Amino acid sequence: MTFDIIGLCVERPDPVTAVESVLPLAGGLTASTVEGGPVAQLRHPDGRLLLSIEDARLVRVPGEARRLLGIGDEVEVPHPVWWVESRAPEGDPEAESVARAFTEALVGGTGGLSWSSR
């Protein structure tokens, strides 16, 4: 299982900038890309995977992000919205913290909101 967190961004996101803003927070994190896989992976200095970040996808169908995530009408979801999904290994509090910090930096730079699996 994974801890999933999604940035729902008003403006087209720049994940590289968000990754760069998170690297100093945990001291010694490294970022790399994976051919044919997520845009980036963030790793702990000991080499363990903390976060996988997927490419941004533009969701153009009105209400689709709300429907997919089960978000109620009381929450305003931008439209159209850029969807950036990240996954952290389950049971690793540091990985969840890095995932939340990344998504907060991403949404902070683009406007929007985040959703998580918990």
Predicted segments with their positions:
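Acidic (Asp/Glu-rich) sequence patches and key acidic residues
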Residues: 1-118
